[in-house]
Amino acid sequence: RQMCIRDRYGSANYQVIEDLAGNIFAGYTGVINTSFTGNNLYNVTGKDWYNAMFNDAYTRVISAWNQLDPQRGEFPEVVALADIVKVAAMHRVTDTYGPIPYLNISSGDINKAYDPQQAVYKRFFEELDAAITTLTAFYEAQPGTKLLEAYDNVFSGNVSGWIKFANTLRLRLAMRVVYADAALAQEQAAAAIGNPVGLMTGAADLAELHKPATGSWEYPLYMIQYNFDDSRIGATIEAYMNGYQDPRRGKYFVATAKGEYHGVRTGITPTSSYADSEDLSRVNCTNNDNIMWMTPAEAWFLRAEYELRWGSESDAATYYAEGIRTSFSTLGASGAEAYIADKELTPGSY
């Protein structure tokens, strides 16, 4: 069914790139579609699945970026935004596939060489540094000026929002290379933290693609769970959140008729009776929801990791707790302080 609707529904592309890949691997969701039995977490045999992220990135992101790149001299701030979006998209690709064509993608040569991930990441840092420098200078010179406000469905032209997102993205990438190149990781993390505009800190800084005022829109997870009817929440995240009696469960999941939260175990072969069960919870979402790119809670957790490695343990604990508080407040959930203070609860049964 899904292979027939990929071109019709953007959500189907999202499904094979995100929901049937990272979400399942992490235990956030689990498959209930019985026709997926030959194509699950342990046996991804369909090329339309494992090629999807690669193809989508180059045909949708890189092709658009290549049209903007020649305008860098005339519209440096606009291309800086494009550079940030490119890195945000492509770091997922290299983390999935390893070496990718990247260093010479604007050369016009159709036979691009595959660059080692180390070189790709260093280019990411160079591009983010240049984009952040360009936008910071623009913001400091014209603090109230919007950039592409009529077209920006992420930050509505708010330049400081893009800078905070780029700084936080830089910090994320820095912490990802810490085991490969600790010196580079520390250098890039410090640069992200030290930028005068700063990192994402609260709900106002959320990086998410908003539903446009006009035109068609669909929220992929809603389509996957309520229209395609292909997945439910994962047993892994459910076990942790049930065990910790996490007050955010109702924000993330829809309770069953019994008022409980139950998820799908990773890698199972679903049967018809299992797929039709009313005892499995769905993701709590609507078709009008925004598509999340990055949360401010992640920024606090990354800052905590930085402090744990190169700063003080007390600051690490402070930032980690602030990450939890920010997650709660962003979702509109209460009970963060009790959740942080608890030292007795453990993950539930899987």
Residue ranges and their predicted role:
Residues M3-I5:
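Short, small-residue-biased leader/transition segments that mark boundaries at the very start
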Residues Y9-I24:
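Acidic, Ser/Thr/Pro-rich intrinsically disordered transcriptional activation regions
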Residues T29-V85, A89-G335, K343, P347-S349:
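Structured, solvent-exposed acidic/aromatic patches
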